[in-house]
């Protein structure tokens, strides 16, 4: 077995700048396959990873998030804004539209599991990634969407201005695509980013409601639940924005 020695260490704390820098590095990595580098064709590569992951999550969805009585519980009302139930149902009805639209995007080679434990940025603006077990082909922007969604879920849930970070990451990712030589439409990459990140709300919201329903009645909800709910609503915002784009010409 051949293994690469990773010289850089694991940095326990990342400034927002580092998250943004990595977004650009991922753009350079993906963009190379839009600028002439041949896509790999090995039969074992993951194809349709997001669709497969979404349908796998469905197996563990009890349907609790599609029941109005769930949303009428006092603890749920205190954590999620009015109207979120109707918005979530609309998302569920349009999810397949998003998945179909993602399939139409220009394809790139992707790591498919880019998040902090698998990323080792170097001081020379290089990036080493480990755990390539899910690598494969996906639409431009999907890599960034998964990176962003996983980052919110693991490290940045308490970030006050998530929209600003999403916008900056999208800009930096597109800059990386340009530096790699791609001259295509940035809107395609931004759609891929928003849609793939937003689809995570379809897993996160049912999971949140399932766990909240098991919590004992307490006077104050722990801060971590409030943070996770703000993340879920933000991802729903991204999903809705991408659904609007998918309804027209993506």
Kindly label every feature range from the protein language model.
Residues 182-199:
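All-alpha amphipathic helical-bundle segments outside canonical DNA-binding/catalytic cores
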Residues 5-111, 217-224, 239-242, 248-249:
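ATP-dependent phospho-/nucleotidyl transfer catalytic cores
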Residues 195-250:
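ATP/Mg2+ or Mg2+-diphosphate-binding catalytic cores
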Residues 92-142:
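Active-site acidic catalytic loop and adjacent metal/ATP-binding pocket
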Residues 141-180, 198-217:
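Active-site activation/catalytic loop segments of kinase-like enzymes and analogous catalytic loops
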Residues 33-42, 177-187:
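Surface-exposed helix-capping loop/turn segments at secondary-structure junctions
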Residues 7-12, 130, 150-159:
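Glycine- and acidic
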